[in-house]
Swiss-Prot record:
PTM summary: Ubiquitinated by BIRC2/c-IAP1, leading to its subsequent degradation by the proteasome.
Protein name, entry field: Max dimerization protein 1
Organism: Homo sapiens
Positions with biased composition (Low complexity): 175-184
Keyword annotations of the record: DNA-binding, Nucleus, Repressor, Transcription, Transcription regulation, Ubl conjugation
Chain positions covered by the region annotation Disordered: 30-68, 173-204
Alphabetical list of PANTHER family matching this protein: MAX DIMERIZATION PROTEIN 1, MAX DIMERIZATION, MAD
Cellular component GO terms, alphabetical: chromatin; cytosol; Mad-Max complex; mitochondrion; nucleoplasm; nucleus
Length: 221
């Protein structure tokens, strides 16, 4: 009972409020809408809010689309500078530009693969040459060691030969002294013999002359 009374009172208050608004609107010269209950009022608020949201989202979408197209134009201009288009680059459409860009990208990828293959080959050759250099270094160290050993052995043999030569020189010097003394003695004996022979030859000649003189004297007699 009390609840029904409160509802009636609320309806009377809303009606009075409506009448007051109509009077004010009539005074200002414009009509007013029919009174709404709470549900209608909430629905109206939601509709207005959705309209505002839709208009806001639409304006946001338009702004984003505008920015996207501006960015796309900028990217196409940069792409024209990267892709070789030829002398008539200003007449190319967006489709032809993208087609040439695709072909150019494929060509660059092929060049990149070839470069990677060549780099791998050069790296393998470098590793091979490095191993060869290490082997040559080890071989050089070994040869230097062998050469130093041979030179040390050769120097030892040279010293031994020098010692042998000195000893043989001393021995030959003694032989030469003995032979020289023998030669001098033989020379003296030879000179004495020659001297004797000369003396014998002289005496024989004298005797022969004397015999000739005596023979001549006899013939003269």
């Amino acid at each position: 009972m009390a609840a029904a009374v409160r509802m009636n009172i609320q309806m009377l208050l809303e009606a009075a409020d409506y009448l007051e608004r109509r009077e004010r609107e009539a005074e200002h010269g414009y009509a007013s809408m029919l009174p709404y209950n709470n549900k209608d009022r909430d629905a109206l608020k939601r509709r207005n809010k959705s309209k505002k949201n839709n208009s806001s989202s639409r304006s946001t979408h338009n702004e984003m689309e505008k920015n996207r197209r501006a960015h796309l134009r900028l990217c196409l201009e940069k792409l024209k500078g990267l892709v070789p288009l030829g002398p008539e680059s200003s007449r190319h459409t967006t489709l032809s530009l993208l087609t040439k860009a695709k072909l150019h990208i494929k060509k660059l990828e092929d060049c990149d693969r070839k470069a990677v293959h060549q780099i791998d080959q050069l790296q393998r050759e470098q590793r091979h040459l490095k191993r060869q250099l290490e082997k040559l270094g080890i071989e050089r160290i070994r040869m230097d060691s062998i050469g130093s050993t041979v030179s040390s052995e050769r120097s030892d043999s040279d010293r031994e030969e020098i010692d042998v030569d000195v000893e043989s020189t001393d021995y030959l010097t003694g032989d030469l002294d003995w032979s020289s003394s023998s030669v001098s003695d033989s020379d003296e004996r030879g000179s004495m013999q020659s001297l004797g022979s000369d003396e014998g030859y002289s005496s024989t000649s004298i005797k022969r002359i004397k015999l000739q003189d005596s023979h001549k004297a006899c013939l003269g007699l």
